[in-house]
Structure formats: C-alpha cells, structure tokens
UniProtKB/Swiss-Prot annotation:
Its EC number is 6.3.1.5. This is NH(3)-dependent NAD(+) synthetase. One of its GO terms (cellular component) is cytoplasm. It comes from Helicobacter pylori (strain HPAG1). One of its GO terms (biological process) is NAD biosynthetic process. Belongs to the NAD synthetase family. Keywords: ATP-binding, Ligase, Magnesium, Metal-binding, NAD, Nucleotide-binding. It is an enzyme of class 6 (ligase). HAMAP family: NadE_ammonia_dep. The lineage of its organism: Bacteria, Pseudomonadati, Campylobacterota, Epsilonproteobacteria, Campylobacterales. Catalyzes the ATP-dependent amidation of deamido-NAD to form NAD. Uses ammonia as a nitrogen source. Homodimer. It catalyses: deamido-NAD(+) + NH4(+) + ATP = AMP + diphosphate + NAD(+) + H(+). Mg(2+) binds at D37, E137.
C-alpha cells in the first residue's frame, strides 16, 4: 500500500514529541553523519524540538571529508545546532594497539565510540538519544550492537531504506545527500551495497515479503524463490536475518532462582 508521506511526517513528529515527553525529557541529541538516515532524523527532530535538538558530528580517521561537509550543509539549511567531536585520536589509539584488527573490528570500535560520546552528551545536557537506524538495517542486523543501534527511541526504525528515501524527498533533504551511495562511513571505501551484496532497491521488496509472510515464524526460503526471488539473494538475506536476530532482542536474564 502506498504511503502518504506528508501524513507520515506528521505522525513521526507526533511520535517524537510524545515519546520524549513521556520519558521526562525536553531535549534530544543524535549523531549526524552526513548520510541519509541521520539527515532525516535530524530534520524531524528540528521540526519538533527546534533549539532543544542537537546534533553531534563525530568523524573518524577513515571518514570521507565530503560527509562532514554534507552534514554541515544540512545544519546550515535547517538551522540545526551541532557540536563536532572528532573520534580520530581514539580510533588511532585502537589501531596502534591492535595492528591486526579487521576492518569490522575497527568499524565496530568507532560505532561504539560514537555511542559513548552521544550518551556522555546526553548526561551532560539532560537530553534523550535518538536513533537513526532504518528497518532494513535492523532486520538484517546491519549495525553495531551497543553502537549505532543504541538509542532511547527511533523514529525511522519501522521504515525500510527505500521508504526513508521517499521521506527524505518530502523533507527537502539536499540532493547531494540523497544521491550518494549509502555508507556507514566506518572505513575507507565502505558502502552498504558492497557489504550486503545488493542495493536496497533489490533487498527491500524481499524484506517486506519476509515480514508479511513469516512474522514470528521460521522463514521458508522455497516459498520466497517461488515468488520469483533469486535463490542466492534469498539465501544470503535470510542467513543474515537469522544470524543477527539477537541484535534486536533485549539481554536474556535468568529467572529468579527458587530452590525447592
């Protein structure tokens, strides 16, 4: 069913206002990378909280300079308050101590550094941390646990990446941000498509069918291939979903021990 994106904007703004108020906060903070998802969240937060919304720009030593430029341009266009904290000195220390660390380890370390900066700012300013992960990323587990997935509330967590693009157009996000390849900007040359093997335009229809057909049920790959999806695509995507499902769950806590 086609979404009414203007109504969606009103709904998400209402969600942000009510949930932040419900948790006893007046101010919010979020990470702004220069990418699409954080730009959308930033503009939504600015609409609702105005001067009580604040963005943190946290480039690493591997961040592309144009991403910072795009983030600053967004801040200027929408009058977004921001602070820049470079995490480059800290990821350099990690690199010097763990010279054999894989790109994934380095990327996860940077994501968790950013989380630490966000929550430190949250405490200092009495602000609530707002998440920027979309539904495609969440279903695929394409994020860092206690890193970029960490937040108090997330306005776009139920929107697939292709839907975030449509929402961004309605919010007048700059075309430079809209048109660049999605990337977590965790290491040089990284892109979502390289990591996932497919563009979101291919992945999202499959994710939508998986959610519609197999919610709270085991995924039947044969059913999906019968719908016309490529067998390798189905195998790769379902494998990711199953392997990373734990990232969407709260920690499992042992029940209270009652000796008989």
């Amino acid at each position: 069913m086609q979404k009414d994106y203007q109504k969606l904007i009103v709904y998400l703004c209402d969600f942000l206002e009510k949930e932040v108020q419900k948790k006893g906060f007046k101010k919010v903070v979020y990470g702004l990378s220069g990418g699409l998802d954080s730009a959308v969240v930033g503009v939504l937060c600015q609409k609702v909280f105005k001067e009580n919304a604040h963005a943190l720009l946290m480039p690493s030593s591997a961040s592309m300079p144009e991403n910072k430029t795009d983030a600053l341009s967004l801040c200027k266009k929408f009058s977004i308050s921001y602070t820049e904290y470079s995490i480059a000195p800290y990821d350099a220390i990690f690199g010097s101590h763990f010279k054999d660390a894989s790109l994934t380890r380095k990327g996860n370390f940077c994501a968790r550094l950013r989380m630490a900066f966000l929550y430190d700012y949250s405490l200092k300013s009495d602000s609530l941390v707002i998440g920027t992960s979309n539904k495609s990323e969440r279903m695929l587990g394409y994020g860092t646990l206690f890193g970029d997935l960490a937040c108090a509330i997330n306005p776009i967590g139920e929107l697939f990446k292709t839907e975030v693009y449509e929402l961004a157009r309605r919010l007048n996000i700059p075309k430079k941000i809209l048109n660049k390849p999605p990337s977590a900007d965790l290491f040089v040359g990284q892109s979502d498509e390289k990591d996932l093997g497919y563009p979101y335009s291919v992945i999202d229809p499959l994710l939508k069918d998986i959610e519609a057909l197999f919610k709270n049920k085991p995924i039947d790959t044969e059913t999906l291939t019968q719908l016309g999806y490529d067998e390798i695509l189905v195998k790769n995507i379902t494998s990711r979903i199953q392997k990373n499902a734990f990232k969407l769950e709260l920690p499992t806590i042992a029940q209270k021990f009652n000796p008989k």
